[in-house]
């Protein structure tokens, strides 16, 4: 029936069996309730009702370790169609016709990548899945790897047929142990059913798939750094061209896409390019998964059609700003993205629209901020993250981000000057134009966007020497170890993963990571969070 019960206790089980399973009646008191309304089904809840889940559809509804459940939902049907009914050229054309663009960053056309590798001279070729999700507070790829690993494998199999590859790698950060185990289990089950390995399903096609664990460096999300890491080298980007499609893993042509991109492929092959094109916008078809966090009522993973507006996401799905406060900004795209304002709430959310504003979808992080947030502090936080994650290979990123962080810290502490603002703009332009890889080239977007849309807050720090939103941030948020019961609620709400601690033990806030958004303050039931 699809009925959803919440906060079920052991003593509720007898009533559920008697009323729902035997009599078909709903136990009203166990239903999810919002604003006085009870919702019988998961799909009826406003947070889910307004979404369009295709990639995340099976996450949480099927057993990720049971291949039979995946097969029961048309799993590997697209692979069989590609294997027995389509050529590599036809597969590439179908993906290009669908308009599928990479979901891991800049939105590069996936079909073009595949076709470029297909056209390379015959020889060893690789298919690589980028599961190195490094943005703070982003868990889209992790959710798919843990909840629907076979969709990734099927997508990679189809890519292998298209490109003419017989070997692939899934690169996952070691901080995702469950994802690693689920992927390895899924690969083993697929091998048992001859869906992976040699002479698959009695054909001449063979494909071996490996899981490679990364150390968690943010820069390894960049293609050439990722392939270097798989090879056993230090994860550092290289100069391009040549591109990965020509000179990738072990200097061979390589198809490299992220988890969400590969997961969409089986749906496109099975349902057709026109179906996928019917969702989203003309130039950005399909859906996109986002991690909605920050000062918003409903947080979590969402999936919406491309072209959905920020207003729909934040206010319809997210339920609006916490405690009735005013919306101020949303940071989109993680450390490589920009901050947008209230005037952008009705703008279609797609690759091209965001690029015009100096922002990017990136992996899909969405951090919502209310009227009490200091945007200079936000810019400083993301610059601190980027500077720490810089591989150090190129001078613009290594030294430029360090100097920018010093300037931002000076400004936040009310010790900056007007000349510092000019220097920030000059450094931002130089780094964006001269850095070696995408990490460095986009590292300044949070600073550039906040300078553009929230310049008055910079002026408050450097001219007035007083910020109405943070008072210079001399004070920091701390957790009282006596009052803290270790319930973990603040850890779940923190968009920056700045809170650590064991259950039933006092938690601790990392002041370097904390952006003082107040999410933990508002959710603590014990009043243990204070400002010092």
Regions from the language model: what does each represent?
Residues 396-402, 489-508, 519-532:
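Iron-sulfur cluster-binding cysteine motifs and their immediate structural context
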Residues 1-29, 78-95, 123-127, 131, ...:
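Ferredoxin-type iron-sulfur electron-transfer modules in oxidoreductases and energy-metabolism complexes
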Residues 31-95, 251, 257-272:
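Flexible inter-domain linker/hinge segments
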Residues 148-162:
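Histidine-anchored nucleotide/phosphate-binding helix
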Residues 62-77, 129-141, 244-249, 291-296, ...:
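Gly-rich Lys/Arg/Thr-decorated short loops/hinges at beta-loop-alpha junctions or inter-strand turns
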């Amino acid at each position: 029936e699809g009925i959803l019960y919440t906060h079920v206790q052991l003593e509720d089980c007898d009533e559920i069996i008697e009323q729902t399973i035997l009599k078909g009646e709903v136990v009203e008191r166990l239903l999810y309730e919002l604003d006085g309304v009870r919702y019988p089904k998961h799909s009826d809840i406003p947070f889910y009702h307004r979404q369009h889940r295709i990639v995340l559809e099976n996450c949480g509804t099927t057993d990720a370790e049971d291949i039979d459940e995946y097969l029961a939902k048309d799993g590997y049907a697209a692979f069989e169609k590609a294997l027995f009914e389509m050529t590599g050229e036809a597969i590439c054309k179908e993906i290009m016709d669908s308009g599928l663009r990479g979901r891991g960053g800049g939105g590069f056309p996936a079909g073009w990548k595949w076709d470029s590798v297909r056209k390379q001279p015959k020889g060893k070729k690789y298919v690589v899945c980028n599961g190195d999700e490094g943005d703070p507070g982003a868990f889209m790829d992790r959710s798919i790897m843990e909840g629907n690993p076979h969709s990734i494998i099927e997508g990679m199999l189809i890519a292998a047929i298209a490109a003419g590859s017989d070997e692939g790698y899934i690169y996952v950060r070691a901080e995702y142990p469950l994802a690693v185990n689920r992927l390895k289990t899924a690969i083993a089950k697929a091998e048992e059913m001859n869906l992976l390995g040699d002479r698959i399903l009695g054909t001449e096609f063979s494909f071996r798939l490996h899981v490679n664990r990364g150390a968690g460096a943010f820069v390894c999300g960049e293609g050439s750094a990722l392939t270097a890491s798989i090879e056993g080298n230090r994860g550092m980007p290289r100069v391009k061209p040549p591109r990965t499609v020509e000179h990738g893993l072990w200097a061979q042509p390589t198809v490299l896409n992220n988890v969400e991109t590969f997961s969409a492929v089986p749906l496109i092959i099975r349902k057709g390019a026109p179906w996928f094109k019917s969702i989203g916008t003309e130039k950005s078809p399909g859906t996109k998964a986002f991690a909605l966090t920050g000062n918003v009522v409903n947080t979590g993973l969402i999936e919406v059609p491309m072209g959905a507006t920020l207003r729909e996401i934040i206010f319809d799905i997210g339920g609006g700003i916490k405690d009735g406060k005013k919306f101020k900004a949303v940071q989109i795209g993680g450390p490589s993205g920009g901050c947008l304002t209230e005037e952008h709430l009705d703008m279609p959310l797609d690759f091209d629209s965001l690029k015009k504003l100096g922002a990017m979808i990136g992996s899909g992080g969405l951090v919502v901020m209310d009227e009490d947030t200091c945007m200079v502090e936000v810019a400083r936080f993301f610059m601190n993250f980027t500077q720490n994650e810089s591989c150090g290979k190129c001078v613009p990123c290594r030294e430029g981000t360090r100097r920018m962080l010093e300037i931002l810290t000076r400004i936040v502490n009310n010790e900056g000057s007007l000349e510092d603002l000019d220097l920030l703009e000059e450094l931002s332009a130089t780094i964006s134009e001269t850095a070696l890889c995408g990490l460095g080239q986009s590292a300044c977007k949070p600073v550039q966007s906040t300078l553009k849309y929230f310049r008055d807050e910079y002026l408050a720090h450097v001219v007035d020497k007083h910020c109405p939103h943070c008072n210079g941030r001399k004070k920091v948020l701390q957790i009282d170890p006596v009052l803290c019961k270790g319930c973990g609620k603040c850890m779940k709400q923190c968009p920056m993963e700045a809170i650590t601690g064991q259950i039933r033990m006092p938690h601790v806030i990392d002041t370097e990571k904390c952006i003082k958004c107040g999410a933990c303050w508002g959710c603590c039931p014990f009043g243990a969070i204070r400002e010092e």
